[in-house]
């Protein structure tokens, strides 16, 4: 039997557990241009110093583990470790801090949102020393941005494909979201597009259920698109949801959409996953399809103020993974969304360069290096009376999506679409003439009603509908 040898301290290894602060809390660190920066809102367990928690976040999301290990000596931890370089208390909150962590770019695989998130928002969110942890923002350095393909086409190319300029785009989610046959579904699509909408949409739950298999839906919808285009002389589209149980099935549906000649398909990027989304985005770029992205499941991740991931991070991740549209909330509808916060991440979706602005929740300056922008989609509980606010908030580069606000019109689907189109064009013209939509929007809509009986009927139906609930996630 070989006798056990004693480990000498001079050999460079000492077993045991040491404070994360000794290695991963580095307040003197000078951030590099190539570092990925993260801002975490952390709530330590009672009695745990914030410096220890910040260091633990940096360690557990990069090179650290709970004890000293032999193999630390086989690499350069100083080169690869994450560093908590600053901690600041959250104003007005007890025992909450913003911890800033810098990650060397070499920790992440090029062009992989999946790998980036696996590290930064992985096991660390279950760490016992933390009562709660939320990723508020990420700074993606240009060196890493350039490894991503990004949106298949972007806002300008989409406008060129559609030949639609100078106004926002109009959409509608077909309702009821589940239960229609494929033929009746196609009929609703046709009526909405003929009435004046640019797009109609599959609901995020619509995949290939027994009442309507995907191939039947695709065929009837394609027929509706071509018929509406022939009658109106405008390019029309429908977001055909290609999301499926496997990537192979998803790609089969995308190929079918391409063969039918439709302009746009759709994916549920959070439930479908970033790997599937990036694969689909690359296919769409190579084959001339626009890609509409729905954010189903986002509120499970982003709605709680103290724990999870803020939507601005999910929006940045989608821009890197690839998508031409992304649902972003409405500010004025039925879904969660504070105005300044929403406008902050809308700018992060659309603009090429966004300055740090804590008043809008933007913790870092972000340079997208000419990566195409993503068009925000405002959807959820909106109707014609919201149109002035939507035009004022989002401007032209947005898709305004009225589901119930189209299909709930008392005269039917086509009149509902016409009402929305008249309201949009009236508000756009009023804005272009210098009128203040925030103050005069109601007058603009009432004036347009004189020339559009469809709009007048819609205004009468929804004149008392409001969604006045306080926003949970505030700055």
From Swiss-Prot:
The keyword Methyltransferase does not apply. Heterohexadecamer of 8 large chains and 8 small chains; disulfide-linked. The disulfide link is formed within the large subunit homodimers. This is Ribulose bisphosphate carboxylase large chain. The modification 4-hydroxyproline is found at residues 104, 151. Belongs to the RuBisCO large chain family. Type I subfamily. The record marks 334 as: Transition state stabilizer. Gene3D superfamilies: Ribulose bisphosphate carboxylase, large subunit, C-terminal domain, RuBisCO large subunit, N-terminal domain. It comes from the Eukaryota. It comes from Chlamydomonas reinhardtii. Residues 1-2 form a propeptide. The modification N6-carboxylysine is found at residue 201. It is an enzyme of class 4 (lyase). Substrate binds at residues 123, 173, 177, 295, 327, 379.
